[in-house]
Amino acid sequence: MGPAVTPSLDGDAAVDHGAPPAHGVGLARHRGPVRRAGRRIAVAAGALVIAAGAIAATTATPPVVDPTDPSGVSMPTSDGSGWDRVFSEDFADGTSRGGFEAAYADRFSVYHGFADTAGTGRYQASVLSAHDGVLDMRLRTTKGGTPLAGGIVPLVDGQWGGQTSGRYSVRMKSDEVDGYGVAMLLWSDENVWEHGEVDFPEGALGAPAYLNVHCLEDPAEKCVHYETSASLADWHTYTIEWTPARMSFLIDGEVVGTTTESIPTSRMHLVVQAGSNEGLPPRDAAGSLLIDWMTIDVPADGAEPQASLPSGGATAPEQGSWTADTPPGDQQDPEVG
């Protein structure tokens, strides 16, 4: 076996790819949760409204069940009232492993050649391929001992850069792979953490999907932290609706939470990344993150679309051992990086 490849810790390499600088300094983001019975929320009091019963969004096109689609649900072709579709991809063009970057260069920026979030893995374009109508991020450790990671940034009209509001949907699932995690996130175009970070979904591969909204005034802290009932091991469509007044979060077209806290005001772009957690993954750990399709909508000219709301207003159900009315000091939540 050859020597292990040392991941680059050059922050500029990450910035050049639209990645958070945290990728260049080894900050873990997909740390596995502490396992406790029940679900937990960790939020500032009143910051997050949880849907008492998940309710279909009123602005989005209902999912269309399609048994011929790789995930069983086809990519929506309509963008809903008040929104305009500016990006959509269903990965119909197949590639060899490692051939994705060249084949999709007009549609995606691909992470390559720098350290992943935990600082132990390395982003490589070679982990990416498109086959059978899905994007496959194949995570594994090289013979030299380097864990490989994958990351993509959609390019709207072939151009790099984000939005100041939008609706972002990705349909994905993953294998359960020890030592690896995934995050779909909104990240600052200027790579300034204080501009905001919104992670949904986020979590260890094959584990529960988490929602994390980092506090604008102190981004190392999370103003919203919530474990959903969805498993990353199953096909689900995850949607972030971001408006100036509110952010809402949907799974399979149903609202699971909404917040008015720490809403970004700067330009943000969508990232989907999968890499190692804290420490080195087991050498034999290997598996895939699969993405069936992804879409980006922006407000139509002259329109001010509203983020979707759950029914029942601010009434939140019991979540694990406490409710949204429980004082923050009484909360006990598992931590996800």
What does each model-found stretch correspond to?
Residues 7, 59-62:
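N-terminal compositionally biased, intrinsically disordered segments and leader/signal-like regions
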Residues 16-17, 58-59, 66:
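Generic N-terminal simple sequence motifs
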Residues 1-38:
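Terminal targeting segments of Actinobacterial cell-envelope proteins
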Residues 28-30, 38-40, 50, 62-337:
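GH16 jelly-roll
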Residues 44-47:
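Sec-dependent N-terminal signal peptides
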Residues 49-59:
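Hydrophobic alpha-helical membrane-insertion segments, chiefly the h-region
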